[in-house]
Amino acid sequence: MKRTKSIRHASFRKNWSARHLTPVALAVATVFMLAGCEKSDETVSLYQNADDCSAANPGKSAECTTAYNNALKEAERTAPKYATREDCVAEFGEGQCQQAPAQAGMAPENQAQAQQSSGSFWMPLMAGYMMGRLMGGGAGFAQQPLFSSKNPASPAYGKYTDATGKNYGAAQPGRTMTVPKTAMAPKPATTTTVTRGGFGESVAKQSTMQRGATGTSSRSMGG
């Protein structure tokens, strides 16, 4: 009997320790996770063009112009491409599309589209761009083109979105916001044309995922 009691006491001590130490371990892990999240975020500014950037950053006109021009090049490389002007206008609105030269790897969905495009594709105009410090504390700046639709029927209507369809809120330049550093990473080059409404679907899906992630984070922090 004494041996049995001894075993039970030892088992009780182990279980008690596990139950009471686990919350502490979780708390420590949470602190490290939060610290990691903080380090992975970056403060960026949203501008419509180089003039807006220069006005907000006196003495940085050259940097603003360079970032703007780089964003334009990135937009040409990564923006959604459409085989026809009509498809692009249906997504982004009248006066919001421009012809873009065919890029290596671009492939219309069928021969009719290839003939209609005559070697060129259509893409939305760059509505603005995000600008932030380069990773590693360099003296330069990172930039990311932003697009916006003026078609009320589009999920991208009145919003700033990147080439992947991720939503960054109202299309109002001059704002500053915090984004993950991954938001400033180069996006994949566009290699195929998008069907009419396809980009809007991507925006809608991304918005749903963002809302879900925000809700999960709020519930976790609230316990």
UniProtKB/Swiss-Prot annotation:
Region (Disordered) location: 178-223
Lineage top rank: taxon: Bacteria
Segments of skewed composition (Low complexity): 178-195
Biased composition regions of type Polar residues, renumbered to the chain: 204-223
Signal peptide: none
Pfam families given in the database record: DUF1190
InterPro entries xrefs: Biofilm_formation_YgiB (IPR009576)
Listed NCBIfam families: PRK11653.1
Protein family: Belongs to the UPF0441 family.
Protein name per its UniProtKB record: UPF0441 protein YgiB
Origin species: Escherichia coli O6:K15:H31 (strain 536 / UPEC)
